[in-house]
Amino acid sequence: MKQKVVSIGDINVANDLPFVLFGGMNVLESRDLAMRICEHYVTVTQKLGIPYVFKASFDKANRSSIHSYRGPGLEEGMKIFQELKQTFGVKIITDVHTAEQAQPVADVVDVIQLPAFLARQTDLVEAMAKTGAVINVKKPQFISPGQIGNIVDKFKEGGNEQVILCDRGTNFGYDNLVVDMLGFGVMKKVSGNAPVIFDVTHALQCRDPFGAASSGRRAQVTELARAGMATGLAGLFIEAHPDPENAKCDGPSALPLAKLEAFLTQIKAIDDLVKSFPELDTEH
């Protein structure tokens, strides 16, 4: 079955092409740390031959606590992104939270991301669609995989069909997430075989029901990522940090930066193997 290709500059993203890595840090903690992390990702992905897009947030507008670190904000965040692009020649993905942010962010980065908690907000979707930028839609934890088709339709009606879909787990009772890997195929089917990527970092989140910050299951990142990529996906979304215990956001789910090369070596081997197989239609 023909898979849709979405192009991020010279990077082609599709379910039957070699996987693209969307990776970086959860939130821009500082200019220097962003440079350090980006450089490490670039070095490793170039060595392994993996197409790469740098990820970070300039504003975590949906933190649980009013006291939690949010990021440097729009103006300073765009300055850091511009320097990263000039220094390393990377493509960049970041999330927007208001309609007013969409165009200024799209003027700097290559992919703008629709956050899971905001994915049904029509005004935001329409503003993002109008930019003409490549879009990454985070599937909300609270909807079924089939419902993502309605979000894709909103972007199409807004004149933008350059949409990538991202699964980051589904609510399983209170304060827990599970990954329904059968849902990957459903997301492909209802979207006309749009590229589907897997956010393994945020799928590892779990919460203290009375706490102000998410916990995580970093010890299981490799097994979950391997399982997801074995289904045949367009990309993997992962965050890493040189000191996860002291990260300002989602450290318990972040891959230790020093483990990135070993981790990606395994993921690439699985992706290469799965995509070497001929397509097998078991429905008919």
From Swiss-Prot:
Tell me the PANTHER family matching this sequence: PHOSPHO-2-DEHYDRO-3-DEOXYHEPTONATE ALDOLASE (PTHR21057)
Q: Which family does it belong to?
A: Belongs to the KdsA family.
Q: Where in the cell is it found?
A: Cytoplasm
Broad class of the protein's primary localization: cytoplasm
The EC designation for this entry is 2.5.1.55
UniProt-recorded Gene Ontology molecular function terms: 3-deoxy-8-phosphooctulonate synthase activity
Q: What is this protein called?
A: 2-dehydro-3-deoxyphosphooctonate aldolase
Copy the pathway line from the protein's UniProt record. Carbohydrate biosynthesis; 3-deoxy-D-manno-octulosonate biosynthesis; 3-deoxy-D-manno-octulosonate from D-ribulose 5-phosphate: step 2/3; Bacterial outer membrane biogenesis; lipopolysaccharide biosynthesis
One of the GO biological process terms:
keto-3-deoxy-D-manno-octulosonic acid biosynthetic process
Question: Which superkingdom heads the taxonomic lineage of this protein's source?
Answer: Bacteria
